[in-house]
Every structure is written in structure tokens, then in C-alpha cells.
Amino acid sequence: MKLWGGRFTKEENQLVHNFNESISFDQKFYRQDIAGSIAHVTMLAKQGILTEEDRDAIIAGLKSIREDIDNGTLKITTESEDIHSFVEANLIERIGDAGKRLHTGRSRNDQVALDMKLYTRDEIDETDVLLKGLLEVLLKLMEDNLHTYMPGFTHLQKAQPVTLAHHVGAYYEMFRRDRGRLADIRKRMNYCPLGSGALAGTTYPLDRGYTAELLGFDGPTLNSMDSVSDRDYLIELLAALSTIAMHLSRFSEEIIIWNSNEYRFVEMDDSYSTGSSIMPQKKNPDIAKLIRGKTGRVYGALMSMLTVMKGIPLAYDKDLQEDKELTFDAIDTVKGCLLLFTGMVSTMTFRKDVMEASAKNGFTNATDAADYLVNHGVPFRDAHGIIGQLVLLCINENKALDDLTLEQFKSISPVFEEDIYDAISMKTCVEKRVTIGAPGAEAMKKVIEVYKKELNA
């Protein structure tokens, strides 16, 4: 069934139909389309535009269509142009002329705008659940590793000692912001376009506020032309999804590095690893690599959406049909990555002894050694130079700062005393950092309590 054709004298070319149809992908939101139609006819009956008898018949028919699609007895085919015409054709077939009244006071332009918003809202909620699940795993890691010392890095060079809890906490902050972005998008987009018509509203006395309320929106949109052509919320969503993917990619990159024989910080669980067809010894972190690789795919969706929108005049244009496949793919990709990443991280084994040894052997306590001198009256710039000389001495003798004798310390500066060893121990270096946001256990415990309250809110 076509929703148009009265003014045409020729049948649609099959190639044109194949190129023009969207049901092969917009069938994904058949549930949202039916939900929108149920709300629409409920409002029409309330306003006296539709009889209660027709309303009840239409709603019953729509629910039966949804049920039959759900259980597989009704197959969606590409004979229809889109999911809207498929549902309407099946409705008319089931209930007769009453079904022809479904589209009263409505255009496919505001209908698809509604469907896309309903679908996007549902997917934001599902993505948020996955993000929350990841945060719960990261929070458990933080609680269990408050005293797991490791090197912190700048320029991929060992810099200062931190804890695994603190390092994981940095990613917690990223994914925490991601949840905030999704919530912000959901709030801003939560206005109902239904009732905007093709672009100029309708002459029917629709109650748009009532329809918006039925569908869980905060209210109706305020400009009908913008309502049918607005895809800002998709651009914002794709930007947020790209940011989530980027955060997953950064963490995946570190896991790949940590898993290498050169680092040996982590051991991947067998269930989240793959092997080689030729090298029997290989155990590859391919899930982390695929997550890293799929990030570009999500970025591509964002750039495609921006490009689609950049030259479209008001109001609705067929170009907007291109918003769906790329949005669907980006959402599915990020959700899949979140699910796999959470499982991968929750099953990894951290080699705590290797991490602490790496921190000790990388001069990560050099800054604390300089601070020791400053606390004994040496100007910081002079202290910096003194510790630099000690580091050079250690490099030449293949030692860590902790391995130097007191005589060797004093050979560079007489200020050093026996308490230097306690001052540069990994435990002291980390635990004396107690300001909010620092790696010390006391500071971390306060932050963890904040996170717990947020997750349980």
C-alpha cells in the first residue's frame, strides 16, 4: 500500500522504489510507530475528531499488529515504502474503513520525527543502563585496589606513583560525564513533534499537549517547521556516542599495552581472548582491539549526520531519511562495545607485584625526593638538579633510588638523612597525597563515597 499516488499516471519504477524505500531499516522502530499511533487516535477521540468506536477498533488492530510482529507471525516486507505505510496497510486489512482514519491530522513528517525521538529516548535509557553497569565494575576495582601501587604516566613515560584505584578512577570520571551528557540530551529532546503535520500544523483541533503527555514528553514542540526537520538531538547523541567510544578506545589501548609481555600489568581472561592460526603461544587481546577499531565507525556516523544536515532548507527533506541507518548502527556499536568491555574488565587479572615493581624501577618517586629536599630548606630548583644527578647515578649503576646507599645520597647533597628511604617509598609517595582527587587512599575513599551515592540515587 502506498500513502500517495492519486496524481500520478505511471507506476513507480522498481529501481526508484528500491532506492526510495526505508522499511528495510526503519522497521526497527515499529513499536515506537505503533505507540505513537495509539496516542494519536486516543487524542483524536478525546477531541471529537474520531468516534470512540473507531478509536477502540484502531487501537485493538494496532496492538494485534504489534503482537504479531513480536511473535513472528507477521513478517515485515519491503513491498511497503516504510514502516508507517506497512502498519497502516495491515490495519486497514484487519479492521476495514476505520483504519483509514488513523492518519487524520497527521503527516509522515511529524510521524517519523516522533518515531525517531521515541526510539532515541529508549536507546539513551538502554545505553545509560550499560554505562551504569560499567561504572559499578570500575567502582569495585577502585575499592579493591586502594593500595595497589603503579606508575602514573605522562608522554607514556613513567612519571609519578599512583594506585590502580586512582588510574581506574580517571576512566570512571570519563564514563560518569558520558552519563551526564546522555541525560542532558534526553532532557533537551523530550518535546513531542506530533501534531506539526507536514510543516504547517493542521486545521484539526488537536490537543498536542495531551498527546505529548500520553507519550511521556515534557510538552509539545513550539514550531512546526523546526519540529519536522530537527535532527539536532541526533547530532548531539552521535557526538556523545563518539565520546563514549573514544573513552572505551583509550582504556582499551592501555589494556592492550598493559597486556603486552613488556608490561605484564594484566592477564586477559581466556574467555575474552583469541589465538593465532599459526603461532600456538599467542593469546591476543582482540576484543580491546576491535573496540578501539570500531571507534572510527561511530565517528563516521557523526560526520555523516553533520554532512546530511548542512545544506537542507526548511522544512522536511528526503535527505533526512539518511539519519536512521547511521544512528542505528552507532547506537548498536556503542552498546555492544560497552557490554563486551564491561565483561572484559571484570574478568581481567591485575599483576599487582609487577605494577609496584614497575613504579619503583621507573624513578616515579623522584619528585618526592625533590620535595624531601625542599622540606629541608633546599630551593626547589636546586633540589630538582640534585635529584637529576641522583637519577643519572642510578641509571649508570642500574639501580632504583631506593637502592642507593645513604653515602651515595650524601655524595650529591649532605642534606639527606636516613629518613629519605621512608620519604621515597611507594606507600609514602602515594598515601601522603590526601587532597580531593589525589591517589592517596583517604582521598580516594571520600571520592568513592560520592560515586556510590550517585549510583544508588
Predicted feature locations:
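Conserved hydrophobic residue
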Residues: L50, L74, Y263-R264, P379, ...
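Generic, well-ordered alpha-helical scaffold segments in large soluble proteins
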Residues: H40, G61-D68, N90, R94, ...
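Short runs of predominantly hydrophobic/aromatic residues within well-ordered alpha helices
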Residues: S37, H84, E88, L234-L237, ...
